[in-house]
Amino acid sequence: MVQKWSEVLWMKERTREVDDNYESYWILENWDDGAYNTGSLANGMTVTLDQEYEMSYFTFGAVDQKTGMNLVKVRYWNDTHGSEEQSVRAQLLEKRDANNNKYYIVRFSHPITANKIHMRLGRDWWDMSAMKVGEIHFHQYDDLERDINDIYANETHTTLKEAVKEQTIADLEKRLEESDAATGEKHPLYSELKLDLQTARALLNNTLSPVYKVHPEITAKKDAHLGFTGLNAWQPLGKTAYAGESVQVIVGHPTKQNGERAELQLVVTQQHAESASVSKTVNLTVGKNEITIPQLTSNNFEKGGQLYIVYTGNNDADNYAVRVNGGSDIPVLDLYKKTGQERTDAIKKYVEDLEEYQSKISEKHNERHKAETSNSVAYTYDEQNCILNATDIMMDEMMYSLPATQVWNSIKGTTTDEKAKALDQALQAMEDTMTLFYQHKGLSNEAVKEKGNNALPSQHLNIRYMRMFAGAFMYAAGNHIGVEWGSATLTGAESWDDFGWGIAHEIGHNINQNSYAIAEITNNYFAQLLTKDEKGTRFNYEDVYKKVTSVTVGRA
């Protein structure tokens, strides 16, 4: 197993002494120490070892750190290159031990040989709360990690070597389950190595998760001129993952090299979340990204949720592809730019998948969650809070992120064909609603060939299953509209009349023009539009005419 061959304890500030004191630590009250911006040896910390060692990671304690870190830069020296510094690409993996104490693993993209290590830490967001490093453990590169890496033909772990058989993987799994004789603990990289072996078996059996081709047309970069900010650029990946779970996000691009920064972010969400703790983003690089799903809430229900990808560039010809290893598969319907038979076929396939999936959620929970040692999901099955009970439907102007059982139960019909037709009609009703609303804002893709500032947004709105605050039954927030369990039945609509005042009212909040918005008033214009045929309007046009021609300022 892993050999713990050096232990370093840091004193406060930038002391470089070993003090044999478990209560001391390195601290910097800043958001970056040279991991985001270019730093020098004056930044970070340097450890000189007693001799040269081969390693692929090291770990350190986070003390009582309140805010996480997500960036690390590593330089090293060895006998071969003397005083010439070397660099290695590294990822910072946030972990929690059995007592829920936070610690970090600094994992290199490949093993290195070093006699001196220099580490710089940081965040890719502005936060001046303290970064802290407690005891550091260096781990010598071990045979198990080497042997697991050796079954792959490439660094990104997308191809197996020809000699790999089922027994090869089974033997490695048996070794991985062995505990260290001295400590009784599993390998520090247990979750990551287990996922590597699961991926290997999926490759061997041709059952790997499909590749998701990113839509580069969906980007916030195109919508800055619109004057309203309630839009959402998330693209669903068909995965849900629990807090603390290890996942691998493999990013491919035809012209970029492994390790190069991708114009992509992974969005991690909390299922049935409060409005303030719905998501967190992780920047991605081309190649393999190892990610530990962060915990977004401390409340007493399952922790975790759907995963999404966001394209942050502005090039319609960009060609990113993404595969997620790990997590749990959930049904997704991607109707972006789909029309005619392609749309019909996609909806029918989704209905078939959803029917099978929703009937087995409780069973899947008991297999994957109730038996899980992680505190994140080790709960008795609760239909309204299980993170497996989720699905996404992405249209051009709207995305639904709702409980799978609620979506299924609200679709009318008995046969697959009847349900597919009813779902198509329900989704068309929402698409027609958004077309109506945007036309009244002067936005359309039908006006002229070069649509310019009058084009429809490239992003969509997002109606999400959320936890309500006191007195609310739905709400509009920065990039989503929150609905509770009883309102998560939008796929049962036969026309836009079925959406009602509330949904239109919240959509109005998110597409209200900032230049004239008066909260709870101007957004109701869209609610009036949606309900006027059935219920009339709360104003008459004669009064409107008198007001706008009166040369007076202020409300009517």
Where are these regions (language model features)?
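Aromatic, loop-rich ligand-recognition surfaces of beta-strand-rich domains
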Residues: E23-E85, N100-D143
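Exposed beta-strand and adjacent loop surfaces of beta-rich binding modules
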Residues: M55, M69-K73, E173, S246, ...
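Non-catalytic propeptide/linker segments at domain boundaries
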Residues: N289-A390, D396, W408-S410, D417, ...
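Predominantly extracellular/luminal regions of secreted and cell-surface proteins
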Residues: M1-S24, N205
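Beta-rich interaction/scaffold domains
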Residues: D142-L204
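Catalytic cores of extracellular degradative/oxidative enzymes
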Residues: E367-A556
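Beta-strand-enriched, solvent-exposed domains that form extended recognition/catalytic surfaces
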Residues: T199-R343
